[in-house]
């Protein structure tokens, strides 16, 4: 039985987040107000900056392509063809906000199904309400949670396909392959892991390969930007830089500490007395990668 209180929380958080972004919506997303009021969003910014307002294909430019993987890029390209009228930027945001709320609500119910004890932790997390519409992260969160749900149901083929969708949406879900590999290894299901990985790879390539072939520079721009980015808001390294700590070699530190975190996670998962579920350890793989990353 679905709790009315839970539904109320989901709708209330969605409303609060919309309220937070409403100042920018009312002022046409102008700067510096979007930063002062903490309502900046890539959704509005990239609509015109990446020429979606003219229905331009998001990966046709080598220098101004859409800096997100294909599912987000193609999805927003399709949205741009809707008859948005004179107030197109706000309607573009509204359509995206509606989709994000749908993904948020469904993913919250999936978390409840995976483990009811933690159902409220996800929607009530301050970072969720504060940044619900800052970009399209809920698209990938939705597919990641579905990946976990079906994996722990032993429906590996569906889970592998969904992981391919998740990686083609934001790429960082590739870190799930680490705990998945260890779970299969512990269960002596090596061939099942190979099949799982092939399903994931085929779906990823289905979305990426055509664009990479015909618009390689535009497709590669997402990876190029992430490889070249410095320490940004939310990362440990940016916080340390505010303390006037010399971080000339922070890229090397980031790589070394990330590899150490991954190595420790592998040892930890292998030495566990019993095989964990993906729901129990997926978070650890994300933490191992994001804690020392240049961008959080």
Residue ranges and their predicted role:
Residues 1-115, 227:
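TM-lumen/periplasm interface segments of multi-pass membrane proteins
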Residues 105, 230-295:
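Aromatic/glycine/proline-enriched transmembrane-helix motif characteristic
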Residues 109-126, 154, 158, 275-278:
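Transmembrane-helix signature of polytopic, membrane-embedded enzymes
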Residues 127-130, 146-147, 157-181, 283-291:
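Membrane-interface alpha helices of multi-pass inner-membrane proteins
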Residues 132-140:
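Short acidic/glycine- and proline-prone juxtamembrane loop motifs at membrane-interface regions
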Residues 140-156:
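Specific aromatic-rich, kink-prone transmembrane helix
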